[in-house]
């Protein structure tokens, strides 16, 4: 004899039990519709993802025959960008413009001078920072003479003395020694009279 449509009652475990049914008979949980189809679509997606990954790996392959050269991206930094960063950093330090400076000379250990003509000078005494902005020229110490003499320090004066000592030696080495009896002043006439005696005679 078959019983149909028997009402179910949930037990403490949450499983449905047929009331008045056979002992041990339980209601089977219903499966979601299209479960096998969902699994198939998931498998297809993973296969497609693996294919895409393989294509990407083939494109990114480094080295080997038939691969294109990898171009290194070179970022060109302009001087204006560096200047902006520098000005921003200087603004943080609180620098002030110093006006009325016509030239700045920086003396090096090699005896050369880094010369700035009409530079922009900024200073921050609290940060002990000075900036000199402008066109710089590297010149020899001898080129800057005599206007630079009052700017020379002790080290520069010693190097100037060395240069002064070296110059006569170079001039002597550069010229051939004069032969005896040869007159070096051809254009200057010889003095015949004594001018001192002539002036004394005029005074008397």
From Swiss-Prot:
* GO BP terms, alphabetized: in utero embryonic development; negative regulation of protein localization to endoplasmic reticulum; protein transport
What residue spans carry the region label Disordered?
A: 1-43, 168-190
Q: Which PROSITE patterns match?
A: NAC_AB
Pinpoint the NAC-A/B domain residues.
80-145
Query: Disulphide bridges in this chain?
Result: none
Chain intervals with Polar residues compositional bias: 1-11
Keyword tags? Chaperone, Cytoplasm, Methylation, Nucleus, Phosphoprotein, Protein transport, Transcription, Transcription regulation, Transport
Q: Name one GO cellular component term.
A: cytosol
Record's protein name: Transcription factor BTF3
The encoding gene: Btf3
